[in-house]
């Protein structure tokens, strides 16, 4: 098969809609000219399959998005107007946060609202100073003697920002038998705050474990008739998934709509939140145009018909991992890698023969373009696309930061492909590994380590040797979010994978290893998720080896895992709810603020 050593730039038609089903047009799209450097083009490559060789099919749902429609951000002039307005509103909110005369509870609730509305990144230093002031003046000791709501709220905010506070703060709300006081149930707002705080627990913090059980049992008993519609919506939202496990953009859009219904809403804060949400959304649209052009040029979605095309879902995932506007490079890098992972996973899981998979794994390990001579045609296409993309990412990093990261990127891919290969061997041998053997491989095959290594080089400006060495060893900040990724994925996909004949899954392996029912195995996996979350919470306390932006990115990957797999596998089989979420985050602006 011949390959062209050309760089092709083909314009994209913007006459269709992003979603193939009719949807309201939100923003007028405008064309964008983008040049991309590449060494090998895969766009005009074709291949033929061996007709006599049987290939499995997973019958995946087809892609439901139309890449011909790429939304644009507003004009530069409009963005500048928005920036000026946002700057003025931001100054007003900053004054409120820095008001040393404000009552502590008022300040804490303001900080909580700022963060829920998606504005925390604008006020990081202000919030830290305010919390420092709160702690140094004895504020935390004071609120623990006043109300459960104030105690739980301050506890959660302080732990979120790396302060070491003791679970003993809640001991004062227990009776002589060690049970939480029954009269606390009369204050739903306080119970809701206690529930949210309990998810910041560390290993061995039994008081917080008891607090969660106590809060959940009461919150589930409440009805809208008893507490009112507004509070009932908050309770249901929290019980579905706690705040600490939600992605920030989805939480922001939900919180904005909930907050604007409040009679006592801070109108300046609300206006800034809506403006900020729409401004960041315009950045996502710009990023998506760039990534979509790359995907069309790569051409894998149209050439490899057996595999899932999930670029939009991969980009949406990347927004959850790094939502801040300054992290476009991270979003694009993670989206590209997850798109590749999705297709290559299908090659290993469904389409490739074991001999072919071993050849592909060897090619990735060697990272030599000449290795394509040993590959079947469809793998040549995939390997060249991967080879070009990763080399380009490494080149850009060398040019911009002076660091050759290619060995780290290629090792991450080699490790992933070896993990995929091990799973393929289990499948071909029709063997079910023990849970320990399975999981020791599966957290790597989740692609979590790979995504986080690519994310590290995108969000960290000053790359440190010690950090890189620990990345290579898959430090806890890499492994633990990946554990959560794998466990959440397995909970959501177990039934479908069993139907496809795949023998390795956390649930099925746990059933076989422990000799228990599917129900008990599922419960055990959920407990493993909880315990891993507690271990990961410690990364924010006592100072991490890694820079804060990367720590947040790693935690966000775990959050995105919770959200993506909470009600099924929203990446493999995106449903209507998933599509609505994608549209709300990427394309549909929030209606303007009106006084």
Swiss-Prot record:
Positions of disulphide bridges:
none
Cofactor dependence is on: Mg(2+); Mn(2+)
Q: How is the cofactor bound?
A: Binds 3 Mg(2+) or Mn(2+) ions per subunit.
Enzyme Commission code: 4.2.3.27
Q: Which GO terms describe its biological process?
A: diterpenoid biosynthetic process; hydrocarbon biosynthetic process
Cite a GO CC annotation. chloroplast
Q: Which domain of life is it from?
A: Eukaryota
Which residues does Mg(2+) 1 bind? 345, 349
CDD domains, from UniProt? Terpene_cyclase_plant_C1
Q: How is its activity regulated?
A: Competitive inhibition is mediated by geranyl diphosphate (GPP).
Point out the transit peptide region. 1-37
What would be an example GO MF term here? magnesium ion binding
Q: What class of enzyme is it?
A: lyase
Q: Which residues bind Mg(2+) 3?
A: 489, 493, 497
Record key words, sorted: Chloroplast, Lyase, Magnesium, Metal-binding, Plastid, Transit peptide
Q: What is this enzyme's catalytic activity, as reactions? A: dimethylallyl diphosphate = isoprene + diphosphate
Motif DDXXD motif extends across 345-349
Q: In which pathway does it act?
A: Secondary metabolite biosynthesis; terpenoid biosynthesis
Residues annotated for dimethylallyl diphosphate binding in this entry: 345, 423, 486, 489
Subunit arrangement?
Homodimer.
Family to which this protein belongs = Belongs to the terpene synthase family. Tpsb subfamily.
- Read off the domain note: The Asp-Asp-Xaa-Xaa-Asp/Glu (DDXXD/E) motif is important for the catalytic activity, presumably through binding to Mg(2+).
What functional role does this protein have?
A: Lyase that catalyzes the formation of isoprene from dimethylallyl diphosphate via a syn-periplanar elimination mechanism in which the diphosphate-leaving group serves as a general base.
- Name assigned to this protein: Isoprene synthase, chloroplastic
Q: Which organism is it from?
A: Populus canescens
Upper classification of the source organism reads:
Eukaryota, Viridiplantae, Streptophyta, Embryophyta, Tracheophyta
């Amino acid at each position: 098969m011949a390959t062209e050593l050309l760089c092709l730039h083909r314009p994209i038609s913007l006459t269709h809609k992003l979603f193939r089903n009719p949807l309201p047009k939100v923003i007028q799209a405008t064309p964008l000219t983008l040049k991309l450097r590449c060494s090998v083009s895969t766009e005009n490559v074709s291949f033929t399959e061996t007709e006599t060789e049987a290939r499995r099919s997973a019958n995946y749902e087809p892609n439901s998005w139309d890449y011909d429609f790429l939304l644009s951000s507003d004009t530069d002039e409009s963005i500048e107007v928005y920036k000026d307005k946002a700057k003025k509103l931001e100054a007003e909110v900053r004054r409120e946060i820095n008001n040393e005369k404000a009552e502590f509870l008022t300040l804490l609730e303001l900080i909580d609202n700022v963060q829920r509305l998606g504005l925390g990144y604008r006020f990081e230093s202000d919030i830290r100073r305010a919390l420092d002031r709160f702690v140094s003046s004895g504020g935390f000791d004071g609120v623990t003697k006043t109300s459960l709501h104030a105690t739980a709220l301050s506890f959660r905010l302080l732990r979120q920002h790396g302060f070491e506070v003791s679970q003993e703060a809640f001991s004062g709300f227990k009776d002589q038998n060690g049970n939480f006081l029954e009269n606390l149930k009369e204050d739903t707002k306080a119970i809701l705050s206690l529930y949210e705080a309990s998810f910041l627990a560390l290993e061995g913090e039994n008081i917080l474990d008891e607090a969660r059980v106590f809060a959940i049992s009461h919150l589930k008993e409440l009805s809208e008739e008893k507490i009112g519609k507004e509070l009932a919506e908050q309770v249901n939202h929290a019980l579905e998934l706690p705040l600490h496990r939600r992605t920030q953009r989805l939480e922001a859009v939900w919180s904005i709509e909930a907050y604007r219904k409040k009679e006592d809403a801070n109108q300046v804060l609300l206006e800034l939140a809506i403006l900020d949400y729409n401004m960041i959304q315009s950045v996502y649209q710009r990023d998506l145009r760039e990534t979509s052009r790359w995907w069309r040029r790569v051409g894998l979605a149209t050439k490899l018909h057996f595999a899932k095309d999930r670029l939009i879902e991969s980009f949406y995932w990347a927004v959850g991992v790094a939502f801040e506007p300054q992290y476009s490079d991270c979003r694009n890098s993670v989206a590209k890698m997850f798109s590749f992972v999705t297709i290559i996973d299908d090659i290993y899981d469904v389409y490739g023969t074991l001999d072919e998979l071993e050849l592909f794994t060897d090619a990735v390990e060697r990272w030599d373009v000449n290795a394509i001579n040993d590959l079947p045609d469809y793998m040549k296409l995939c390997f060249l696309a991967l080879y070009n993309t990763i080399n380009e990412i490494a080149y850009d990093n060398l040019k911009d930061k002076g660091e050759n990261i290619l060995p780290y990127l290629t090792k991450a891919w080699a490790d992933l492909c070896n993990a995929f290969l091990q799973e393929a061997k289990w499948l071909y041998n029709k063997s079910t590994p023990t849970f320990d053997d399975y999981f020791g491989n599966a957290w790597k095959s989740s692609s979590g380590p790979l995504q986080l290594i690519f994310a590290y080089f995108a969000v960290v400006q000053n790359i440190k040797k010690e950090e890189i060495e620990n990345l290579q060893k898959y430090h806890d900040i890499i492994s633990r979010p990946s554990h959560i990724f794998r466990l959440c994925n397995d909970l959501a996909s177990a039934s479908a994978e069993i139907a496809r004949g795949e023998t390795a899954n956390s649930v099925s392996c746990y059933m076989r290893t422990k000799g228990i029912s599917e129900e008990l195995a599922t419960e055990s996996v959920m407990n493993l998720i909880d315990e891993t979350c507690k271990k990961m919470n410690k990364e924010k306390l006592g100072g991490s080896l890694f820079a804060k932006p990367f720590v947040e990115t790693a935690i966000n990957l775990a959050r995105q895992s919770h959200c993506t797999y909470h009600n099924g596998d929203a990446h493999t089989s995106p449903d209507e709810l998933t599509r609505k979420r994608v549209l709300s985050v990427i394309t549909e602006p929030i209606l303007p603020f009106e006084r």
